[in-house]
């Protein structure tokens, strides 16, 4: 038996260490938490996608009594961006979350389904998406979705 190891590299940043544009995208993700419909979980997630053309598309989680019918903030933002601007790659995606007590201290990461969707989008445009995961204690900065999903399932897996 052979043991192998996978490491994920990311930076822990403070808001003021980001570029002005990245700070704006993070602030938009925080703003997007206010549009979440989280009647059941009271967990409000916001996402903001900066497109190559400079437009920011925001999304938030939208819950449903039938939980599998709910949508996460990341997919809401990404699908809205792709439906509205199908030829524009996403350059940066920021994610923030809060409860009824306020913005979380530590960042949250996308669920598995969102990671898979983000990976597909990254591959579609052959351009990495910088991921900024916001928490009051700091921001996890990742250079690519691949950093969130080291064992990924992509189109090439379905070919001989």
Regions found by a protein language model. Give the residues of each.
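Short, compositionally biased leader-like segments
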Residues: 1-27, 101-103
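Short Pro/Gly-enriched beta-strand edge/turn motifs at strand-loop
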Residues: 27-34
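Short loop/turn motifs at secondary-structure junctions and domain boundaries
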Residues: 38-41
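Short beta-strand scaffold segments in enzyme catalytic cores
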Residues: 44-51
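Zn2+-dependent cytidine deaminase-like catalytic core
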Residues: 58-158
């Amino acid at each position: 038996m052979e043991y192998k190891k996978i490491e994920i590299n990311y930076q822990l940043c403070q808001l003021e260490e980001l570029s002005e544009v990245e700070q704006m995208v993070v602030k938009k993700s925080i703003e997007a938490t206010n549009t979440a419909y989280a009647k059941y979980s009271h967990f409000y997630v916001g996402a903001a996608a900066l497109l190559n053309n400079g437009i920011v598309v925001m999304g938030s989680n939208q819950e449903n009594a039938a939980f599998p019918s709910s949508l996460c903030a990341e997919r809401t933002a990404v699908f809205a961006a792709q439906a509205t601007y199908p030829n524009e790659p996403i350059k940066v995606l920021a994610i923030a979350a809060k409860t009824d007590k306020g913005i979380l201290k530590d960042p949250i990461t996308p669920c598995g389904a969102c990671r898979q969707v983000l990976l597909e989008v990254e591959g579609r445009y052959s351009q990495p998406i910088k991921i900024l995961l916001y928490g009051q204690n700091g921001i996890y900065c990742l250079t690519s979705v691949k950093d969130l999903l080291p064992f990924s399932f992509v189109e090439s897996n379905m070919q001989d």
